[in-house]
Curated annotation (Swiss-Prot):
The record's note on its domains: Consists of three domains; the N-terminal catalytic domain, the editing domain and the C-terminal C-Ala domain. The editing domain removes incorrectly charged amino acids, while the C-Ala domain, along with tRNA(Ala), serves as a bridge to cooperatively bring together the editing and aminoacylation centers thus stimulating deacylation of misacylated tRNAs.
Catalytic activity: tRNA(Ala) + L-alanine + ATP = L-alanyl-tRNA(Ala) + AMP + diphosphate
Gene name for this UniProt entry: alaS
InterPro entries reported for this sequence: aa-tRNA-synth_II/BPL/LPL, Ala-tRNA-lgiase_IIc, Ala-tRNA-ligase_IIc_anticod-bd, Ala-tRNA-synth_IIc_core, Ala-tRNA-synth_IIc_N, Ala-tRNA_ligase, Ala_tRNA_ligase_euk/bac, DHHA1_dom
Keywords: Aminoacyl-tRNA synthetase, ATP-binding, Cytoplasm, Ligase, Metal-binding, Nucleotide-binding, Protein biosynthesis, RNA-binding, tRNA-binding, Zinc
Family label: Belongs to the class-II aminoacyl-tRNA synthetase family.
Gene3D superfamilies referenced in this protein's UniProt entry, alphabetically: 2.40.30.130, 3.10.310.40, 3.30.54.20, Bira Bifunctional Protein, Domain 2, Threonyl-trna Synthetase, Chain A, domain 2
Organism: Thermotoga maritima (strain ATCC 43589 / DSM 3109 / JCM 10099 / NBRC 100826 / MSB8)
Name under which the protein is recorded: Alanine--tRNA ligase
Physiological role: Catalyzes the attachment of alanine to tRNA(Ala) in a two-step reaction: alanine is first activated by ATP to form Ala-AMP and then transferred to the acceptor end of tRNA(Ala). Also edits incorrectly charged Ser-tRNA(Ala) and Gly-tRNA(Ala) via its editing domain.
Cofactor comment text: Binds 1 zinc ion per subunit.
SUPFAM superfamilies per UniProt: Class II aaRS and biotin synthetases, Putative anticodon-binding domain of alanyl-tRNA synthetase (AlaRS), ThrRS/AlaRS common domain, Translation proteins
Enzyme Commission number, as recorded: 6.1.1.7
Cofactor(s) it depends on: Zn(2+)
Length: 863
């Protein structure tokens, strides 16, 4: 076998299958269009709707090199030669086209003829009941029977993903590395019993059955092929190394880690583990952030934060005490940027986000480690509640707590940890309110298989359609005469909520009836559902209707959507190319735009952005819409979002010279129709993500009117001109502060302060006040001693269900009495603490109701 680089292997695979009639598609995003998955975990994920029969394939033969991310075995990453978080999966797919024979023959041809792998190095396994696959391997390929293993369902049968669905047998191809640890002598060593000698390099899945609710298998009318081969494993095979980390995919990254840490690879096994963890994790981190995932405490952001913190923890084990991961990003970009240009474009952003997260975690880790040590010192172990507190308060992932505990030889009981997590999530959901999430809309199965709603809303705001389906409470009905129902029409001008743009609303009318359209959504690919409230009449399946979109609402939404594109372009121009969309809301009354940036915008920057957007509006630039292939659109420099799903033909919305984005939303004909653009707020959403809210058109006009009314009211109240308002308000604020101080002191001076004389003749002055802030009590105590000359002053103030306390001792009594000691004694009784100097001390407590008891026993606390 000749040495091949990762680039050569990747290119050879795709070219081979292109010659076999496959359409070569670019890698889909790591963020799948699947609510059940956080990440793309396999090459077949982008094609799930096809495998499930929900979408007709554009191409029947496809091949890809797909970016994937898995964290299910993250604890093994770095400890084994082949566990990874981020990896690339080579795959060829057939959707009702070729089947087992071609899939097996082509896999064998690629391995033995293109890559030049010696035949004697290859073994396979097949499902024990799959005689067809066995026969192809044995008779067509000529593989000896002894190198074809028959395995059970657990090893060689894929799916279904749930209780029901597509499934089928698979065949796995193994490469013999010759590494013989733990393997029986002689010919007894096989992929079934070796410990690491045989590496699975390719899995061919034959999706030919459908499993029903009873577990019975039914032949599929259209059989599919789904194959997956890890590029990292192919590289190890073709580069003659046992570990994936010794391939050209990882070595440049490992060299960079060696430079930064001063620790050589393969000099110490424990340190080697840490180097491998960092080398693996930095790839995942770079790709995730470049695709718009940012560290947070939930969902994808939490997974990213967990990966970052695990990598940092291993950096600390290598002696790193400051941020360092962001300095390895360039090694990843240099190695993989030609294949995945998104990491080149996002390099600056990745470094900024990562550096900020590293700094944050170092502070958190310092605090968390102190708490960890305190808990261990007190209890000798970490229990579930402690582990959850370390996570919830100090941001230490459970996995990191377990690793630290293991290193310190400390027991960790995490049996109840998940219960605490579930309770927190329950509270979070309750705080958010009821959210409709991942409804199945099973009633849509009653629609014809290839049904798609014809959307006419780009050209029309009114159209005629036919009722195709009516559903109430997730059940189809023939007719409905009152209440809220969900309806599918044959065609509609109503825009379904998508891509951040809210849905249209309006009316549906038919002979003797009408209904209010409250919400419109796309429940499955191309099927638009209208949630309507029937006002009059009876709506029946098959009925002809007129659908009318609320024109003013649509036009306002269009203004805001086009303005969002202009805002995105302006932010890039003012702040830099690292700015990327991280979320949006386009509604008729406002727009909201989340974007990547690492600090708040200054007033000058906000003005620059506003000025740019309004300049483009005043230029009345025509907004152009065209349809093209995804590949051509990306080549032309269009902005595409990784969180959006795009088909083979895409819609490009362009404001010439300003903005060019893939977008399915509704837009104005030219920018002048937006009227006016005004930012109303700018704030942080999460680490590295900012949010701008803005208004346009009549909403902007209303904002200006309201501000003018407010200014006029202030002018009238303050008796000042507009240019005098700021100075007048500042002056009034200072006067209020001074008056509050005088008022407080004046009120207190009128209060009766009692005096108690001790046996030694010392006078103790004490008083209890309501609502006096603690900061004023010291001044009152000073006034009392000035007036009385000498003594001890003890003053209490009840404030917001708490109690504040000051103690003042005159100079001549300091040899006998200590204000700090007195304050601590009293505070302990009041459920608090305090302290200070011998002559003056302050304290606080949680039980103001105990003040009376303290005063009755005052002499006890003076000792």
């Amino acid at each position: 076998m000749r040495y091949m680089t990762s680039e050569e292997i990747r290119e050879a695979f795709l070219k081979f299958f292109e010659k076999k009639g496959h359409k070569i598609l670019p890698s889909a995003s790591l963020i799948p269009d699947d609510p059940q998955l956080l990440f793309t975990v396999a090459g077949m994920v982008p094609f799930k709707p096809i495998f499930w029969g929900k979408v007709e394939p554009v191409y029947t033969r496809v091949a890809t090199c797909q970016k994937c991310l898995r964290t299910v075995d993250i604890e093994n990453v770095g400890k084994t030669p082949r566990h990874h978080t981020f990896f690339e999966m080579l795959g060829n797919f057939s959707f009702g086209d070729y089947f087992k024979e071609e899939a097996i023959e082509w896999a064998w041809e690629f391995l033995t003829q293109v890559l030049g792998v010696p035949e004697e190095k290859l073994w396979v396994s097949v499902y024990e009941e799959d005689e067809e696959a066995f026969r192809i391997w044995n008779e067509k390929i000529g593989l000896p029977e002894k190198r074809i293993l028959r395995m059970g369902k657990e090893d060689n049968f894929w799916g279904p993903a749930g209780p029901t669905g597509p499934c089928g047998p698979d065949t796995e191809i193994f490469y013999d590395t010759g590494y013989s640890k733990g393997c029986p002598e002689g010919e007894g060593c096989t992929p079934a019993n070796s410990e690491g000698r045989f590496v699975e390099i390719w899995n061919l899945v034959f999706t030919e059955y459908y499993q029903d609710e009873e577990g019975k298998l039914h032949p599929l009318p259209r059989k599919n092929i789904d194959t997956g081969a890890g590029l990292e494993r192919f590289c190890a095979m073709m580069q003659g190394v046992y570990s994936n980390f010794d391939t050209d995919l990882f070595q440049p990254i490992i060299k960079r880690i060696e430079e930064l840490t001063g620790v050589g690879y393969k000099t110490d096994e424990e340190k080697d583990v840490s180097i491998r963890v960092i080398a693996d994790h930095i790839r995942a981190i770079t790709f995730l952030i470049s695709e718009g995932v940012f560290p947070s405490n939930e969902g994808r952001g939490y997974v990213l934060r967990r990966i970052i913190r695990r990598a940092m923890r291993h950096g600390i084990l290598l002696g790193m005490s400051e941020p360092f991961l962001y300095r390895i990003v360039d090694a990843v970009v240099e190695k993989m940027g030609k294949v995945y240009p998104e990491i080149v474009r996002g390099e600056g952003m990745v470094k900024e986000v990562l550096s900020a997260e590293e700094n944050r975690f170092l502070k958190t880790l310092e605090q968390g480690m102190k708490v960890f040590d305190e808990i261990v010192e007190k209890k000798g172990k970490i229990d579930s509640e402690d582990a959850f507190r370390l996570y919830d308060t100090y941001g230490l992932p459970l996995e990191l707590t377990l690793e630290i505990a293991k290193e310190k030889g400390v027991e960790v009981d995490v049996q109840e940890f998940n219960k605490y997590m579930e309770e927190q999530q329950r509270k979070s959901r309750a705080a958010m309110g009821d959210v409709e999430f991942a409804r199945r809309y099973e009633y849509l199965e009653k629609l014809p298989k290839d049904f798609r709603t014809e959307f006419t809303g780009y050209e029309k705001l009114e159209d005629e359609g036919e009722v195709v389906l009516v559903a109430r409470d997730d059940e189809t009905v023939e007719e409905a005469s009152e209440g809220t129902v969900e309806v599918v029409f044959s065609r509609t001008p109503f825009y379904a909520e998508k891509g951040g743009q809210v849905s249209d609303t309006g009316m549906v009318e038919w002979r003797d009836g009408k209904a209010l359209v409250e919400y419109v959504f796309e429940a499955s690919e191309g099927v638009i559902v209208h949630r309507i409230k029937i006002l009059d009449g009876t709506l029946r399946r098959g009925q002809k209707v007129i659908l009318r979109v609320d024109k003013k609402r649509r036009e306002a939404t269009m203004r805001n959507h086009t303005a969002t594109h202009l805002l995105h372009a302006a932010l890039k121009k003012v702040l830099g190319d690292h700015v990327r969309q991280a979320g949006s809301l386009v509604a008729p009354d406002r727009l909201r735009f989340d974007f990547t940036h690492f600090k708040g915008l200054s007033s000058a920057e906000i003005e620059q952005v506003e000025d740019l957007v309004n300049e483009w509006i005043m230029e009345a630039i025509p907004v152009e819409v065209r349809y093209t292939s995804y590949e051509e659109a990306v080549k032309s420099g269009v902005v595409a979002l990784f969180t959006e799903k795009y088909g083979d033909v895409v819609r490009v919305v362009e404001v010439p010279g300003v903005s060019k984005e893939l977008c399915g939303g509704t837009h104005v004909k030219n920018t002048g129709q937006i009227g006016l653009f005004k930012i109303i707020s700018e704030e942080s959403v999460s680490s590295g993500v900012r949010r701008i809210e803005a208004v346009t058109g009549f909403s902007a006009l209303e904002l200006l009117r309201n501000q003018k009314k407010l200014i006029d009211q202030l002018k009238e109240i303050l008796g000042a001109r507009e240019d005098e308002l700021t100075d007048r308000v500042l002056s009034l604020r200072e006067k209020v502060k001074e008056l509050e101080k005088k008022l407080s002191q004046g009120r207190i001076s009128e209060e009766r302060i009692a005096m108690k004389q001790l046996e030694d003749g010392v006078k103790v002055f004490h008083g209890v006040f309501e609502g006096v802030e603690a900061k004023h009590l010291g001044g009152i105590a000073d006034n009392v001693l000035k007036k009385e000359g000498e003594g001890i002053v003890i003053l209490f103030s009840k404030f917001e269900n708490k109690v504040s306390l000051v103690v003042k001792v005159s100079e001549n009594l300091l040899g006998k009495y200590d204000a700090s000691s007195i304050a601590r004694n009293i505070a302990k009784e009041l459920g608090g603490n305090g302290g200070g100097r011998k002559n003056f001390a302050q304290a606080g407590g949680r039980h103001p109701e105990r003040i009376k008891d303290v005063l009755e026993r005052l002499e006890e606390f003076l000792r």
